[in-house]
Amino acid sequence: MMRTVYLLSIIFLAACSHKIVAERTTYFPKRIETMSNSIKKENVWVFIMAGQSNMAGRGVVEPEDTVSDKRILSINKDGEIIIAKEPLHFYEPERTGLDCGLSFAKTLIKKIPDSISILIIPTAVGGSSIRQWLGDSVYRNVKLFSNFLSKVEIAKQNGIIKGILWHQGESDANEKDIPLHKQRLHLLFSKFRAAVGNNELPVLLGELGSFSENPVNFNLINNTIHEYAVEDKNSRVISTKDLKDKGDHLHFNSKGQRTMGKRFANAYLSMH
Protein backbone atom coordinates (compact mmCIF):
# COMPACT_ATOMS: atom_id res chain seq x y z
CA MET A 1 0.00 0.00 0.00
CA MET A 2 2.73 2.45 1.00
CA ARG A 3 4.68 1.59 -2.16
CA THR A 4 1.61 2.35 -4.29
CA VAL A 5 1.08 5.71 -2.58
CA TYR A 6 4.77 6.52 -3.05
CA LEU A 7 4.66 5.70 -6.77
CA LEU A 8 1.47 7.71 -7.26
CA SER A 9 3.08 10.66 -5.49
CA ILE A 10 6.09 10.50 -7.82
CA ILE A 11 3.83 10.34 -10.88
CA PHE A 12 1.79 13.31 -9.61
CA LEU A 13 4.89 15.42 -8.93
CA ALA A 14 6.33 14.56 -12.34
CA ALA A 15 3.07 15.56 -14.03
CA CYS A 16 2.99 18.86 -12.13
CA SER A 17 6.61 19.56 -13.04
CA HIS A 18 5.92 18.86 -16.72
CA LYS A 19 2.90 21.18 -16.63
CA ILE A 20 4.94 24.00 -15.08
CA VAL A 21 7.69 23.62 -17.70
CA ALA A 22 5.13 23.52 -20.51
CA GLU A 23 3.48 26.72 -19.27
CA ARG A 24 6.84 28.46 -18.86
CA THR A 25 7.98 27.63 -22.38
CA THR A 26 4.67 27.97 -24.26
CA TYR A 27 5.71 31.13 -26.10
CA PHE A 28 9.41 30.40 -26.40
CA PRO A 29 10.57 30.72 -30.05
CA LYS A 30 9.92 27.64 -32.16
CA ARG A 31 12.81 28.44 -34.49
CA ILE A 32 15.95 30.54 -34.42
CA GLU A 33 16.56 33.03 -37.24
CA THR A 34 20.24 33.59 -37.98
CA MET A 35 21.36 36.66 -39.88
CA SER A 36 21.52 36.01 -43.63
CA ASN A 37 23.35 39.25 -44.41
CA SER A 38 26.08 41.13 -42.58
CA ILE A 39 25.65 44.62 -41.15
CA LYS A 40 28.42 47.19 -41.03
CA LYS A 41 30.00 47.21 -37.57
CA GLU A 42 29.63 50.96 -37.26
CA ASN A 43 25.86 50.55 -37.64
CA VAL A 44 25.51 48.07 -34.76
CA TRP A 45 25.19 49.28 -31.17
CA VAL A 46 25.99 46.54 -28.67
CA PHE A 47 24.73 46.31 -25.10
CA ILE A 48 25.84 43.60 -22.68
CA MET A 49 23.45 42.26 -20.04
CA ALA A 50 25.20 41.11 -16.85
CA GLY A 51 24.36 40.21 -13.27
CA GLN A 52 22.18 37.53 -11.74
CA SER A 53 18.66 36.14 -12.12
CA ASN A 54 16.66 39.35 -12.46
CA MET A 55 18.86 40.28 -15.42
CA ALA A 56 18.85 36.72 -16.76
CA GLY A 57 15.06 36.88 -16.55
CA ARG A 58 12.49 34.83 -14.68
CA GLY A 59 9.33 36.38 -16.11
CA VAL A 60 6.83 34.48 -18.24
CA VAL A 61 7.21 35.03 -21.99
CA GLU A 62 3.78 36.13 -23.25
CA PRO A 63 2.42 36.77 -26.78
CA GLU A 64 3.42 40.45 -26.77
CA ASP A 65 7.02 39.39 -26.14
CA THR A 66 7.19 37.25 -29.29
CA VAL A 67 7.16 40.13 -31.79
CA SER A 68 10.68 40.42 -33.19
CA ASP A 69 12.38 43.23 -35.12
CA LYS A 70 15.09 42.57 -37.69
CA ARG A 71 17.05 45.53 -36.31
CA ILE A 72 17.23 43.92 -32.87
CA LEU A 73 19.78 41.13 -32.65
CA SER A 74 21.22 38.76 -30.07
CA ILE A 75 23.38 35.63 -30.02
CA ASN A 76 22.70 31.93 -29.56
CA LYS A 77 24.72 29.60 -27.34
CA ASP A 78 27.17 29.05 -30.21
CA GLY A 79 27.88 32.78 -30.47
CA GLU A 80 26.06 33.21 -33.78
CA ILE A 81 24.18 36.44 -34.47
CA ILE A 82 20.42 35.87 -34.51
CA ILE A 83 17.20 37.86 -34.58
CA ALA A 84 16.49 38.59 -30.91
CA LYS A 85 13.58 36.70 -29.39
CA GLU A 86 12.78 36.25 -25.73
CA PRO A 87 14.17 34.64 -23.73
CA LEU A 88 17.61 35.99 -24.62
CA HIS A 89 19.60 34.13 -21.97
CA PHE A 90 20.47 30.46 -22.51
CA TYR A 91 22.78 29.52 -19.62
CA GLU A 92 20.09 28.04 -17.36
CA PRO A 93 17.51 26.44 -19.67
CA GLU A 94 15.56 24.96 -16.77
CA ARG A 95 15.09 28.40 -15.21
CA THR A 96 15.24 30.97 -17.98
CA GLY A 97 12.35 33.28 -18.75
CA LEU A 98 11.50 36.78 -19.88
CA ASP A 99 14.24 39.34 -19.26
CA CYS A 100 14.36 43.07 -19.94
CA GLY A 101 16.58 42.95 -23.03
CA LEU A 102 14.05 43.01 -25.85
CA SER A 103 11.96 45.68 -24.12
CA PHE A 104 15.12 47.77 -23.72
CA ALA A 105 16.01 47.45 -27.39
CA LYS A 106 12.46 48.10 -28.64
CA THR A 107 12.32 51.30 -26.60
CA LEU A 108 15.76 52.46 -27.67
CA ILE A 109 15.34 51.71 -31.36
CA LYS A 110 12.47 54.21 -31.61
CA LYS A 111 14.82 57.03 -30.58
CA ILE A 112 17.92 56.31 -32.68
CA PRO A 113 18.65 56.57 -36.44
CA ASP A 114 16.97 54.00 -38.71
CA SER A 115 20.39 52.92 -39.95
CA ILE A 116 21.34 51.56 -36.52
CA SER A 117 20.71 47.99 -35.34
CA ILE A 118 20.97 46.88 -31.71
CA LEU A 119 22.81 43.75 -30.59
CA ILE A 120 21.96 42.50 -27.09
CA ILE A 121 24.51 40.10 -25.59
CA PRO A 122 23.41 38.03 -22.55
CA THR A 123 25.92 37.11 -19.81
CA ALA A 124 23.84 37.08 -16.60
CA VAL A 125 23.72 33.95 -14.44
CA GLY A 126 21.14 33.50 -11.71
CA GLY A 127 22.40 33.37 -8.13
CA SER A 128 25.86 34.73 -8.92
CA SER A 129 27.50 37.07 -6.41
CA ILE A 130 29.69 40.03 -7.30
CA ARG A 131 32.57 38.29 -5.53
CA GLN A 132 32.17 35.36 -7.92
CA TRP A 133 32.24 37.72 -10.90
CA LEU A 134 35.42 39.34 -9.62
CA GLY A 135 37.02 35.96 -8.94
CA ASP A 136 36.01 34.49 -12.31
CA SER A 137 34.28 31.65 -10.47
CA VAL A 138 32.51 28.82 -12.23
CA TYR A 139 28.86 29.13 -11.26
CA ARG A 140 26.10 26.98 -12.75
CA ASN A 141 28.62 25.76 -15.32
CA VAL A 142 29.57 29.29 -16.41
CA LYS A 143 33.01 30.79 -15.76
CA LEU A 144 31.58 34.21 -15.11
CA PHE A 145 34.22 36.77 -16.06
CA SER A 146 35.82 34.60 -18.74
CA ASN A 147 32.41 34.22 -20.34
CA PHE A 148 31.96 37.99 -20.20
CA LEU A 149 35.33 38.44 -21.94
CA SER A 150 34.42 35.98 -24.69
CA LYS A 151 31.15 37.82 -25.29
CA VAL A 152 33.01 41.14 -25.42
CA GLU A 153 35.08 39.70 -28.28
CA ILE A 154 31.92 38.71 -30.15
CA ALA A 155 30.57 42.21 -29.53
CA LYS A 156 33.73 43.86 -30.87
CA GLN A 157 33.67 41.71 -33.99
CA ASN A 158 30.11 42.69 -34.79
CA GLY A 159 29.56 46.23 -33.57
CA ILE A 160 30.39 49.04 -31.17
CA ILE A 161 29.86 48.38 -27.46
CA LYS A 162 27.72 51.21 -26.13
CA GLY A 163 26.86 50.13 -22.61
CA ILE A 164 26.30 47.51 -19.92
CA LEU A 165 22.99 46.69 -18.25
CA TRP A 166 23.59 45.41 -14.71
CA HIS A 167 21.18 43.93 -12.18
CA GLN A 168 22.68 42.08 -9.26
CA GLY A 169 22.92 42.19 -5.49
CA GLU A 170 20.40 39.73 -4.10
CA SER A 171 23.22 37.25 -3.43
CA ASP A 172 25.21 39.97 -1.65
CA ALA A 173 22.39 41.12 0.63
CA ASN A 174 23.99 39.81 3.82
CA GLU A 175 25.94 41.30 6.73
CA LYS A 176 29.31 40.11 5.41
CA ASP A 177 29.03 41.38 1.83
CA ILE A 178 26.98 44.58 2.12
CA PRO A 179 29.89 46.71 3.48
CA LEU A 180 32.05 45.60 0.53
CA HIS A 181 29.45 46.00 -2.19
CA LYS A 182 30.23 49.52 -3.40
CA GLN A 183 33.96 48.84 -3.55
CA ARG A 184 33.29 45.64 -5.50
CA LEU A 185 31.10 47.53 -7.97
CA HIS A 186 33.99 49.91 -8.61
CA LEU A 187 36.41 47.01 -9.10
CA LEU A 188 34.15 44.98 -11.37
CA PHE A 189 33.04 47.83 -13.58
CA SER A 190 36.65 48.93 -13.94
CA LYS A 191 37.41 45.42 -15.19
CA PHE A 192 34.41 45.51 -17.53
CA ARG A 193 35.50 48.84 -19.00
CA ALA A 194 39.10 47.70 -19.36
CA ALA A 195 37.93 44.61 -21.26
CA VAL A 196 35.84 46.76 -23.58
CA GLY A 197 38.60 49.36 -23.93
CA ASN A 198 36.47 52.31 -22.89
CA ASN A 199 36.96 53.85 -19.44
CA GLU A 200 33.82 55.95 -19.91
CA LEU A 201 31.53 53.12 -21.00
CA PRO A 202 28.00 53.73 -19.65
CA VAL A 203 26.90 51.30 -16.95
CA LEU A 204 23.21 51.17 -16.09
CA LEU A 205 22.28 49.63 -12.74
CA GLY A 206 18.86 48.44 -11.63
CA GLU A 207 17.68 48.61 -8.02
CA LEU A 208 16.77 45.40 -6.24
CA GLY A 209 13.03 44.83 -5.96
CA SER A 210 11.02 46.25 -3.05
CA PHE A 211 9.14 42.99 -2.50
CA SER A 212 11.82 41.03 -0.64
CA GLU A 213 11.23 39.11 2.58
CA ASN A 214 14.61 40.59 3.55
CA PRO A 215 13.82 44.29 2.97
CA VAL A 216 16.43 45.76 5.31
CA ASN A 217 19.39 44.15 3.56
CA PHE A 218 17.94 44.73 0.08
CA ASN A 219 17.55 48.42 0.92
CA LEU A 220 21.16 48.54 2.10
CA ILE A 221 22.32 47.08 -1.22
CA ASN A 222 20.22 49.67 -3.05
CA ASN A 223 21.87 52.39 -0.98
CA THR A 224 25.31 51.18 -2.07
CA ILE A 225 24.15 51.14 -5.71
CA HIS A 226 23.08 54.78 -5.46
CA GLU A 227 26.27 55.72 -3.62
CA TYR A 228 28.27 54.09 -6.40
CA ALA A 229 26.41 56.03 -9.09
CA VAL A 230 27.19 59.33 -7.33
CA GLU A 231 30.89 58.49 -7.67
CA ASP A 232 30.69 57.33 -11.30
CA LYS A 233 29.49 59.99 -13.73
CA ASN A 234 29.15 57.36 -16.46
CA SER A 235 26.50 55.37 -14.63
CA ARG A 236 22.79 55.64 -13.97
CA VAL A 237 20.44 53.85 -11.58
CA ILE A 238 16.91 52.89 -12.57
CA SER A 239 14.18 52.73 -9.95
CA THR A 240 12.24 49.51 -9.40
CA LYS A 241 10.30 50.55 -6.27
CA ASP A 242 6.90 50.28 -7.96
CA LEU A 243 7.53 46.99 -9.78
CA LYS A 244 5.92 43.73 -8.65
CA ASP A 245 7.32 40.26 -8.13
CA LYS A 246 6.13 37.04 -9.75
CA GLY A 247 4.90 35.73 -6.40
CA ASP A 248 8.21 34.51 -5.01
CA HIS A 249 9.31 37.76 -3.29
CA LEU A 250 12.50 37.67 -5.38
CA HIS A 251 11.97 37.97 -9.13
CA PHE A 252 10.26 40.66 -11.18
CA ASN A 253 7.14 39.57 -13.01
CA SER A 254 6.74 39.94 -16.77
CA LYS A 255 5.32 43.45 -16.60
CA GLY A 256 8.15 44.45 -14.29
CA GLN A 257 10.75 43.12 -16.71
CA ARG A 258 9.23 45.06 -19.61
CA THR A 259 9.08 48.23 -17.54
CA MET A 260 12.65 47.75 -16.39
CA GLY A 261 13.76 47.45 -20.02
CA LYS A 262 12.07 50.73 -20.89
CA ARG A 263 13.69 52.45 -17.92
CA PHE A 264 17.13 51.15 -18.84
CA ALA A 265 16.63 52.56 -22.35
CA ASN A 266 15.46 55.94 -21.11
CA ALA A 267 18.36 56.08 -18.65
CA TYR A 268 20.80 55.43 -21.48
CA LEU A 269 19.18 58.09 -23.65
CA SER A 270 19.41 60.59 -20.78
CA MET A 271 23.20 60.27 -20.92
CA HIS A 272 23.39 61.39 -24.55
What role is predicted for each listed range?
Residues 1-2, 112:
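Initiator methionine at the very start of the polypeptide chain
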Residues 14-15:
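C-terminal motif of bacterial Sec signal peptides marking the signal peptidase cleavage site
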